[in-house]
Amino acid sequence: MKKRNRFTRGKFRTRRPPGTMNETEQAYSEVLNELQRTGAILEWRYEPLTFRLADNTRYTPDFIVQYPDGAMEVHEVKACKRTGGFLAEDDAMVKIKVAAEMYPWFRWFLCGKLPKCAGGDWKFREI
């Protein structure tokens, strides 16, 4: 399969094949595995659903997390700046916010990994 490149802010960005995690998503999956092992969550899946937002507009969240009480959450993983802000393209943030409004039976979260120089912890923000 031929890789497609996108030109973003002066840099080329290569698209990953569907179902392939980037480094930040891989690190977050390890956090979810630990939560599942301890029983804090029932299970999680990577990119299991695609939400239809409008004609020719779709959104695939990174993770769906199910809790023992049956509650479901959508977790979108993004890198964070040193200051704690999320590194996300404007169109991605619009899609996440629209999806959260259209599908209110999920709780929606942005999850971000701070850089090591800022502590390397995870930051969460409910949408």
How does the language model describe each region?
Residues 1-127:
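Electrostatic, structured charged patches in enzyme active sites and in nucleic-acid/phosphate-binding
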